Amino acid sequence: MNMKNVAQLVQETKVVAIVRGLDSGYEQLAQALYGGGIRAIEVTFNQKDPSTWVQTTGAIHAIRETMGEKMAVGAGTVTTVELVQLAFDAGAEFIVSPDTNEAVIRRTKKLGMVSMPGAMTPTEIRQAYAAGADFVKVFPAGTLGSGYIKAIRGPLNNIPLLAVGGV
């Protein structure tokens, strides 16, 4: 799926399933999610244990092989340019980060992937979008509440937002 199609898919479906901490069964999970109407899946990197990164990239690759163009597959908890490259090499189509790291956003865009960095404040949201983000992940949205998201959308209605974290 090209970058435009991935962005359009996320915009239309408004849901990205987040998968964290599985040892196996990614292909079956992706098929079940697809059967339930989910069209985008994010497989997260474990920052505490880099030895699991091979498993994460393997899962991204396996889901891409299994689902083909039916489902957009991305990497989450991407905090470095190195992880952007690992995700891209595995076949990721989008990158999700917990923060706004401009180097990560630039590398993501250079590689032709959709960028979804995390931000919380209006200033961070604007900075992420100005740096090239396709969507800005408002995180932790569950802690902030739906009223916060509604309030942010008023003055920042030109920036595509994703509410993530305890939603």
Predicted region positions:
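Conserved N-terminal beta1-alpha1 strand-loop-helix module at the mouth
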Residues: M1-A90, T100, K110, N158
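Catalytic cores of alpha/beta
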Residues: Q28-L29, T80-A90, T123-A133, Y148, ...
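Conserved beta-strand positions in the central sheet of alpha/beta enzyme cores
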Residues: A40-E42, G74, V96, M116, ...
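Short, ordered loop/turn segments at secondary-structure junctions
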Residues: F45-K48, V78, D99-E102, M120-T121, ...
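Short amphipathic alpha-helical segments and helix-helix/interface helices
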Residues: I60, I105, I149-K150
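Short, glycine/charged-rich "phosphate-handling" switch motifs in NTP-dependent
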Residues: E93
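C-terminal helical cap(s) of enzyme catalytic domains, especially alpha/beta-barrels
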Residues: R107-V114
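Active-site/ligand-binding-proximal alpha/beta "capping" segment
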Residues: F135-V167
